[in-house]
């Protein structure tokens, strides 16, 4: 699970655009205050839909299995993060269909952070959109708000590993480097495979350790595979216990105005000049 600055993101985008082919890929607005949300008994009568990145799918499905009436869940491919217009289009299409197919009060629970502003512009015509007030999904898995996530940052850069990352991330880092080269070479030829490995090495140079985010609810199911990733990438392996609290709260409606952004029709998600997640008016 990748995080970093501009140069780092360039390496990531270049690498994943190439690897995406391997697996068959094809203006400033005024701030507005968010609404009071779920007053009275409105929540009890609301129809809800969850739209989330598939990287969160293992954890969300575990939590939903313990709910009496979990919301319907739609998962979008992780690789869409590298194609923001396609991500916005896919997300918007699910919102539009949900509104067209249902009457009455509606809420869309969003299993995404700001994600590099990839979802800026998505909006609803009738539903309320509920977003975690987070820049990415790492705090969701750790159970931390953005301030807590910032305070918990480790010395040096951490390559985060989670069950969803292991299942859905495009770079086959569970394979040793010579095996990855062989996969690339068969698809693209030796010259391009060499360039892809060079991009990988530059990417991994940004990290000092690989940290597996574990949940008690998941047991030991992914430990061996996470260790293989650390070994194959030559990064020291570590573990940290995450928490299901944030994602569980999202599944139950995300009613906290401190931890969740509630967007009324005509608003979208963005961040202000200080980097705080906020609601803004959709461009006309």
What are these regions (language model features)?
Residues 46-67:
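N-terminal basic/disordered segments at the start of proteins
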Residues 51-58, 80-81, 108-120, 135-136, ...:
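Gly/Ser/Thr-rich loops at beta-strand to alpha-helix junctions
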Residues 70-85, 239-241:
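A short beta-strand-loop structural module common to alpha/beta enzyme folds
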Residues 94-148:
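N-terminal glycine-rich phosphate/adenylate-binding segment common to multiple enzyme folds
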Residues 100-116, 120, 160-177, 262-284:
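Extended, charge-rich low-complexity interaction segments
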Residues 127-176:
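Long, charge-dense
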Residues 194-284:
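Extended, basic/helix-rich recognition subdomains
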